[in-house]
């Protein structure tokens, strides 16, 4: 196989590493059976607190970034960089190690964007964070961040491959948050700081 195919596969496998499951397991907890059942940092925060959640968030961000760095090391084209970024996110969302289930891809999307286009990532981050702090809904901030990244990529005149990549990542974020969106509309979505209970 070519370097491009190997890198896409590696990005998917690296994205598939379920940090939330592994960290929670060290505390004797199956994070998939607590709270929302999601393996991401937000559910880990509700179940185990800030320390474990920050470890999970850090890993989920940087596994996306490392995939991009590997692609650059192989000298892949810009469009392939976008493909690698998306494969890392898909790995997180549909992990081969979890029977193709996984997280929601927000931290991993941010990590890939941080290494693809640091300026765009750093413009997007405070927008999503502001929504989280104002509403205490992580899901609302995540979806807002996805939209903001896409709009900013257009407004700042980013190349087509990057705009397309960001657009697809935003679509994935909305897809994985479809149940959250429904709960937001119903007024039943959990807010940041609420503790998770066993399912």
From Swiss-Prot:
Reactions listed under catalytic activity: an acyl phosphate + sn-glycerol 3-phosphate = a 1-acyl-sn-glycero-3-phosphate + phosphate
Subcellular location, record wording: Cell inner membrane
Keywords: Cell inner membrane, Cell membrane, Lipid biosynthesis, Lipid metabolism, Membrane, Phospholipid biosynthesis, Phospholipid metabolism, Transferase, Transmembrane, Transmembrane helix
Known pathway: Lipid metabolism; phospholipid metabolism
Example GO molecular function: acyl-phosphate glycerol-3-phosphate acyltransferase activity
Signal peptide: none
Disulfide bonds: none
Spans traversing the lipid bilayer: 3-23, 50-70, 78-98, 113-133, 154-174
Biological processes per GO annotation: phospholipid biosynthetic process
E.C. number(s) listed in UniProt: 2.3.1.275
UniProt xrefs under InterPro entries: G3P_acylTferase_PlsY (IPR003811)
GO CC annotation terms, alphabetical: plasma membrane
Membrane topology designation: Multi-pass membrane protein
Family under the similarity heading: Belongs to the PlsY family.
Cited NCBIfam families: glycerol-3-phosphate 1-O-acyltransferase PlsY (TIGR00023)
Known role: Catalyzes the transfer of an acyl group from acyl-phosphate (acyl-PO(4)) to glycerol-3-phosphate (G3P) to form lysophosphatidic acid (LPA). This enzyme utilizes acyl-phosphate as fatty acyl donor, but not acyl-CoA or acyl-ACP.
Subunit structure: Probably interacts with PlsX.
Name of this chain's protein: Glycerol-3-phosphate acyltransferase
